[in-house]
A protein has these predicted regions:
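Short glycine/serine-rich loop/turn segments
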Residues: 65-206, 360-379
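Structural helix-boundary/capping segments
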Residues: 160, 164-248, 262, 267, ...
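Short helix-loop capping/hinge segments that flank enzyme active sites or metal/cofactor-binding pockets
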Residues: 65-85, 294-346, 403-413
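Immediate post-signal peptide segment of exported/extracytoplasmic ligand-binding proteins
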Residues: 52-69, 234-241
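An N-terminal boundary/leader segment
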Residues: 1-47, 57, 266, 441-442
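Acyltransferase
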Residues: 16-24, 50, 256-278, 305-311, ...
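Glycine-rich, small-residue loops and helix-cap segments
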Residues: 15, 26, 67, 73, ...
Length: 442
């Protein structure tokens, strides 16, 4: 896992390292890691690093993080680069003329983008596979496993220590699932938290952004940087957690995941109140998705309809194509009903949680082996649905959430716990994730 941002900032301030060294090391590691990046911005990153070193030499850094390398999922516009969305259908896309606002905000603090990371095509899969640019894999024991998606490259770039932080997008779990599968921290924001301009969309009513890093504090630092605000010290007050036993008792939650989650609760219950209750809004949202379909699939199909019906259709990953084609069954009337249900259940959720934080496993299972799923499209589709089952509901309810690595299985598969709250309560859920992270380490 990477060094954290505060340690790197201290090293820069003390002269123990400099931006050129940091960027050169990041680029070297990136070149040695297959399929993590779609575009490496070597010349631009090194030029930025030399400029940052000159600022440090003059005693005028842009911030304490001036010169630290980061990475961006290849959905974000970065001036002079093509935004691929992980698809060969965009091989001829015109390079971006300017940075997306969130990219520009981090540049103003001196963060250096070294490249654009791999992802599931169009960001439309929870497993992270990409037949066009390869599938990145985390540095874990045993045979390669799915990295989680769709922000697969961003998670692996952090897990392999290429960069201390990378930015992803999340529509149904695309930050939190790869964080869970690779053992990183992943923060998915409420939808309205960031400026979404210059970010290639999947489903406009559900798309959100978020950083992946080695600790919650680094996610909070990147969150502030992306918004152009000063990072605030997160108060470490014990949270009140809500546990819905009917979520945990689902037979699809595997035994290792369930046992680990109960262990997490046992370790924190002496220090934080845990309220066990059925969260009706959660189950009503799940029922709506099951009955009417996934709103994100409906919106994604309409976004990509020209590709689906045009000459570039054959260039699309067959597994992504199958999901987009399947969304044709969702009618406009069903989509409108989903929008109405969503608004209603978001209000219900806020009342039910009453300022508390829902805590649950991030995913019902650990990272699956890569090879069997690559060889079996039907099984791939089945596992993809199961992988997104929990995070998708939280996304439907616009819940900000943190996927926190809280342990591992005996054979080294990461285990993750998800903290999520009512829409707009991002600062609180980040603070509570810091509290939980520190409590479990003590």
């Amino acid at each position: 896992m990477p060094e954290n941002l505060d340690d790197l900032a201290a090293d820069l301030a003390a002269g123990r390292t400099d931006p050129v060294q940091l960027v050169e090391r990041a680029l070297e590691r990136a070149r040695a890691s297959d399929a993590v990046f779609i575009t490496l911005m070597e010349d631009a990153a090194l030029a930025d690093a030399h400029a940052a070193r000159r600022r440090w030499t003059r005693g005028q850094p842009l911030s304490s993080h001036d010169g630290i390398p980061i990475a961006w999922k290849d959905l974000f516009d970065i001036a002079g680069t093509r935004t691929s969305a992980g698809s060969r259908t965009r091989d001829e896309a015109v390079p971006a003329g300017c940075d997306a606002p969130v990219v520009a905000a981090t540049r103003r603090l001196g963060f250096i983008p070294i490249g654009k990371t791999n992802l599931s095509e169009f960001a439309f899969s929870g497993l992270g596979a990409n037949p066009h640019f390869g599938t990145p894999t985390a540095d874990l024991p045993g045979a390669p496993r799915m990295p989680g998606g769709s922000s697969s490259g961003s998670a692996v770039a952090v897990q392999r220590g290429i960069v201390p932080a990378a930015i992803g997008t999340d529509t149904a779990g695309s930050v939190r699932v790869p964080a869970a599968f690779t053992g990183c921290v992943g923060y998915k924001a409420s939808q309205a938290r960031y400026d979404m301009a210059g970010v290639f969309p999947l489903a406009g009513s559900l798309d959100s952004l978020g950083p992946l890093a080695g600790c919650v504090a680094d996610c909070a630092t990147m969150d502030a940087a992306m918004r152009g605000v000063s990072a605030q010290l997160l108060p470490l007050t014990p949270p009140q957690f809500v546990v819905d036993d009917s979520i945990i008792d689902d037979p699809a939650v595997t035994a290792p995941v369930r046992a680990h989650f109960e262990d997490v609760l046992a370790r924190v219950s002496p220090y934080a109140p845990i309220r066990r209750q059925r969260v009706d809004a959660w189950h009503r949202a799940r029922e709506a998705i099951t009955t009417l379909g996934w709103l994100g699939a409906y919106e994604a199909r309409h976004l990509h309809i020209d590709t689906l019906t045009g000459p570039k259709r054959s260039l699309v990953d067959a597994r992504v194509l199958s999901r987009l084609d399947g969304a044709a069954r969702i009618s406009a009337e069903a989509a409108a009903e989903l929008v109405a249900i969503r608004a209603r259940e978001m209000q219900r959720l806020r009342a039910e949680l009453a300022g508390a934080t829902l805590i649950l496993p991030t995913v019902k299972h650990t990272a699956p082996l890569l090879a069997p799923l690559e060889a079996d499209p039907a099984r791939f589709a089945e596992v993809n649905v199961a992988t997104l089952a929990l995070t998708m509901i939280a996304s439907f309810l616009d819940m900000p959430g943190v996927a926190l690595p809280t342990g591992s299985t005996a054979d080294g598969r990461p285990l993750s716990t998800h903290l999520c709250a009512a829409s707009g309560e991002d600062d609180r859920v980040l603070a509570q994730a810091v509290w939980l992270e520190q409590r479990l380490r003590s």
